[in-house]
A protein has these predicted regions:
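Catalytic-face loop-and-helix region of soluble metabolic enzyme cores
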Residues: 1-124
């Protein structure tokens, strides 16, 4: 798949979709539901299906020294997955890792994504 990450450029989502990217990454500043709606509207006008989204978990929650814990990570993951919805979505970060993350927090993020995704599938 052809993927693109346009930081701070949610206005560009329709143009990126039209440019034949398969997956658009949404940064931490933009709402997943809004991104989904923008792509759906743009695709409908073109008579196409909307493309896939990924993102936008805030990696600051994974920093070793920020005071966040499992509860905050779980809450943020659940909110992210709820906003983006289960279809055509890749759970990912809204920007890159910088090397100062707590490995146990990164593991918590991955586990939460798996657990909450399994819950969504079971409820479908």
């Amino acid at each position: 798949p052809l993927m693109v990450f346009a930081r701070d450029a949610p206005y560009a989502l329709p143009m990126l979709q039209d440019a034949a990217y398969d997956v658009m990454t949404v940064d931490t500043t933009f709402d997943g539901r809004e991104a989904r709606n923008i792509l759906a509207t743009s695709a409908r006008k073109a008579g196409l299906m909307p493309k896939q989204l990924q993102g936008n978990f805030d990696p600051a929650l994974l920093q070793a020294d920020n005071g966040s814990g499992q509860v905050e990570i779980e809450s943020a993951v659940r909110e992210m997955l709820t906003l983006f919805g289960p279809q055509k979505y890749i759970a990912n970060l809204g920007s890159g890792l910088v090397g100062t993350e707590d490995p146990s927090k990164v593991a918590c993020f991955v586990d939460c994504v798996h657990n909450f995704s399994e819950e969504e599938v079971a409820c479908a």
